[in-house]
From Swiss-Prot:
Residues that bind O2: H65
Name of this chain's protein: Myoglobin
EC annotation from Swiss-Prot or TrEMBL: 1.7.-.-, 1.11.1.-
Membership in a protein family: Belongs to the globin family.
Residue numbers binding heme b: H94
Gene Ontology biological process: removal of superoxide radicals
Residues the record lists as binding nitrite: H65
Domain Globin: 2-148
One GO MF term attached to the UniProt entry: heme binding
Modified residues (Phosphothreonine): T68
Amino acid sequence: MGLSDGEWHLVLNVWGKVETDLAGHGQEVLIRLFKSHPETLEKFDKFKHLKSEDDMRRSEDLRKHGNTVLTALGGILKKKGHHEAELKPLAQSHATKHKIPIKYLEFISEAIIHVLHSKHPAEFGADAQAAMKKALELFRNDIAAKYKELGFHG
């Protein structure tokens, strides 16, 4: 299930574009997630009061959390599948503290793909999208394995 060097190159090439504005990209990803899957908003006490897209766009906290999410994901992607050290604390917090189901990680993966395609169509064509989907699936599978080790079946 690993990615080839060429696939990692495609993933990290577009990720370089994301890193020019992590907070902005992250905010867009979270807005897309919450609009497409409103049930995910219930996992975020800090954001439950944000009922409209305008509210979400005005929220500095949402922007900051988007930055946090994409910073963590970028750190994992840059490890090219060798992300055990980065993944363990993330899985621990998402399983035991936040209780985030794997399904929600699928939802945010979809949101990431959508946002990257809309913001960077030239760098995120079919091959790059396929590579990113594969990288995100690798991440989710590894998180799911950690969840299982922790006894969380979300």
